[in-house]
């Protein structure tokens, strides 16, 4: 009987140890799940308000476009007085910035230096004005403005990003 109790006690102790180890492993696994930053509605509204304010200061009518990191449309607004072509231009610039993680001006500069390969990139758009939105060096989206001079479009986009990150 004593032998049975010793063996039974040993097995119970081992079972408890196994449960503790598995529990610790599950907690460790859950703790290691990555957290992902993304553009929620509040972030988008902050960026749009800053872009609208900057465009108004500069007395320009622009279309503002914000995409998520996969190039999906999150926000699009054409100001009164902005031409219709700015809708597509803003979308293409924002998508390029989001997908490739660099300003759309990079594609423009590459094309100007003779690299025609830029023209065959899917969703490539060689025109300044689109910027990637990065938080902690991770791309969470892209923003672009279109309707003013290209450098002004980019400056307005940068003001919007700065408003988000402050």
Where in this protein do the model-derived segments appear?
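A general lysine-centric signal
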Residues: 15-16, 93
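Sec/Tat signal peptide C-region and signal peptidase I cleavage site
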Residues: 26-30
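Flexible, solvent-exposed loop/hinge segments and secondary-structure transition points
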Residues: 31-166
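Sec-dependent N-terminal signal peptides
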Residues: 17-25
């Amino acid at each position: 009987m004593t032998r049975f109790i010793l063996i039974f006690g040993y097995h119970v102790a081992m079972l408890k140890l196994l449960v503790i180890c598995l529990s610790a492993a599950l907690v460790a696994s859950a703790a290691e799940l990555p957290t992902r930053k993304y553009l929620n509605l509040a972030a988008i509204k902050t960026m749009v308000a800053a872009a609208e304010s900057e465009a108004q200061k500069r007395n320009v009518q622009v279309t503002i476009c914000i995409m998520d990191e996969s190039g999906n449309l999150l926000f699009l607004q054409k100001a009164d007085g902005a031409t219709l072509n700015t809708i597509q231009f803003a979308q293409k610039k924002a998508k390029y910035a989001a997908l490739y993680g660099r300003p759309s001006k990079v594609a423009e500069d590459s094309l100007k230096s003779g690299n025609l390969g830029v023209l065959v990139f899917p969703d490539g758009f060689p025109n300044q004005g689109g910027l990637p939105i990065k938080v902690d060096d991770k791309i969470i989206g892209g923003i672009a403005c279109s309707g003013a001079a290209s450098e002004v479009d980019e400056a307005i986009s940068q003001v919007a990003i700065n408003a988000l990150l402050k």
